[in-house]
From Swiss-Prot:
Its cofactor is Mg(2+). PANTHER family: ACETATE KINASE, PROPIONATE KINASE. The gene is tdcD. The record marks H175, R236 as: Transition state stabilizer. The lineage of its organism: Bacteria, Pseudomonadati, Pseudomonadota, Gammaproteobacteria, Enterobacterales. This is Propionate kinase. Keywords: ATP-binding, Kinase, Magnesium, Metal-binding, Nucleotide-binding, Transferase. Homodimer.
Amino acid sequence: MNEFPVVLVINCGSSSIKFSVLDATHCDVLMAGIADGINSEDAFLSVNGGEPAKLAHHSYEGALKAIAFELEKRNLIDSVALIGHRIAHGGNIFTASAIITDEVIENIRRVSPLAPLHNYANLSGIESAQHLFPGVQQVAVFDTSFHQTMAPEAYLYGLPWKYFEELGVRRYGFHGTSHRYVSQRAHDLLALQEEDSGLVVAHLGNGASICAVRNGQSVDTSMGMTPLEGLMMGTRSGDVDFGAMAWIASETNQTLGDMERVVNKESGLLGISGLSSDLRVLEKAWHEGHERAQLAIKTFVHRIARHIAGHAASLHRLDGIIFTGGIGENSVLIRRLVIEHLAVLGVKLDHEMNSLPNSHGERIISSKDTNVICAVIPTNEEKMIALDAIHLGKVNAPVEFA
């Protein structure tokens, strides 16, 4: 084993590979980057925010080869002791992270029809990493596994039983790695005992979800069988009356596939504003008086507040509301508006703390006389994946969480 082992974290998307290299002691990021445009002529690699370099080979393996070469240039290639893979969907098979074996790969393949765009890409990443890093232990970390502690009444749909029994149609939830990391950090920040605590975590980004965490376990979450359910998002509609979609399809002669495209790619902040799916653009328009941008933000906030309050009903006690994700960590406006909507819970905002930039890191943003503590905790999914890899794998280094 290398004296200074590192963990390579890989997140393969439908056309990209995001990667990070973290030291195995403190899980500090040593390098990070993205290969994008995979399987196209425009494929490129960018490392540490640098200029994109065109990839000679456009496949997942070609992109990983280029990433391995970058590690070699930095004398890190021989230090890779473990590889952690983010896997989009583990179905009801995986309730925790797992060391990758032939059986694990086969089970990932079995549940891949539940998330075909991402899981098959995840499998390509695993297979390519096995070829390029023979003998290096690999670990799969599932975005759905944290939510496998939900009770049937929380994950079942009100559909005929045969669809659950025969097809596995149920709520699985996503962003689990983020919700798990943030809830663990929240117990420290809020001085809570994990075994007797109640949190609602709001992961707000272009994709967004809420999670109720009781005694350290997920008991409810807003996303469902797919990431479409729940909150309104950048381009996703979130909760929508299926009858409305059936009526639109009938009136406009559109197919089910057309409707799926509409609710996934053309809705949400983009759909209402008609301007952008990027909240930063909409916030600027908000201050300029753009009415539909303002309406999009108000609708976004209303859904978030409603889901936070609803998820609190799954807890025995509400100790804290935690904001995370790109929007949750950076948008002073969204946090303020959401907390104002939650006055019914006795939540009060400290405007000065809320206005601090995200560079201030973990912080409490509620006032001292609030009934429920509100906080901002930057997520760190890469660190969570690396920690899981270290805990499951074999690496000769002392590990520190904080």
